[in-house]
A protein has these predicted regions:
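Residue-level signal for tight coil/turn positions that link beta-strands
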Residues: 61-62, 84-85, 198
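Gly/Pro-enriched, hydrophobic low-complexity segments
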Residues: 120, 143-237
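Short hydrophobic/aromatic-rich beta-strand segments that constitute the beta-sheet cores
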Residues: 38, 65-69, 87-91, 97-99, ...
């Protein structure tokens, strides 16, 4: 009888583990498709001021993306190019493209509450963590899976743990809690204002909140979002970034 119970328990745990990975994979794939093009507004909020910028972004799979700043005038024309684990920055004022060194990867991206490393680790949830379903909860009126993600031993990641809420109907990431190595909650991400982009239902606004900095947050709003568009391969070369429009 004990052997049967152990076998049943093993099958149950293994089944949940597999389902958790599938949920994360489906959610991640939905965010990018084979390729995507988006126009976004980023608002940086601080206790005494706020700043808004707009960008265009193109991506292919998980390895290639390029973002063009379209406003304000001071930053207009700046480009961030991601190729696998490398990030390049084109500065129109200098007419130069520089590769960001490892020492700059943990620095703020354009003054936001995201880092340059966040750009590189876009698919990290799938490949760098083990996955486990904790329970079911309701977020924004939607029934969700609540998942725990723990880093693999060989993974070079910043976070000691992630708690992720993914809705059961459309696989949208509605909420993510980011914990440090001491399992202290550091950052929070919320997705809301759901819209249809083509045949995909997704949060059109994503909010990043650093809990240690009271009153600070970054809000990313997707004004348009198109998937599986044909994007020329030269968009993701250092030679072309100065010509993006």
């Amino acid at each position: 009888m004990k052997i049967k119970l152990l076998i049943a328990l093993f099958i149950c745990v293994n089944s949940y583990s597999q389902s958790a990975l599938e949920i994360i994979e489906k959610s991640d794939a939905k965010l990018r498709g084979e390729s995507s093009y988006s126009e976004i507004t980023i608002t940086i909020v601080r206790p005494k001021w706020q700043k808004t910028m707009t960008m265009k972004s193109w991506s292919v799979g998980t390895d290639y993306s390029v973002s063009l700043v379209t406003s304000p005038a001071k930053e207009k024309g700046s480009v961030f190019l991601k190729r696998k684990n490398e990030v390049w920055n084109y500065l129109p004022s200098l007419e130069r493209t520089i590769k960001l060194p490892p020492s700059m990867m943990t620095q703020s991206f354009m003054g936001t509450d995201l880092t340059n490393d966040d750009l590189v680790k876009q698919s990290s949830m799938v490949v760098d963590y083990s996955h486990k379903i904790l329970e079911e909860e309701t977020v924004e009126g939607l029934k969700c899976w609540k998942l725990e993600l723990l880093p693999n031993e060989e993974a070079t990641v910043v976070w000691g743990k992630l708690i992720v809420w993914i809705d059961q109907s459309d696989y949208m990431q509605l909420k993510v809690e980011f914990y440090d190595e001491d399992e202290e909650l550091v950052n929070l991400m919320n997705g809301y204002n759901f819209k249809m982009f083509g045949n995909k239902k997704l949060p059109s606004k994503i909010e990043f909140i650093p809990l240690e900095d009271e009153g600070n947050k970054t809000v990313i709003e997707y004004n348009s979002w198109e998937f599986d568009q044909k994007i020329p391969s030269n968009y993701f070369t250092t030679q072309y970034v100065s010509r993006l429009k």
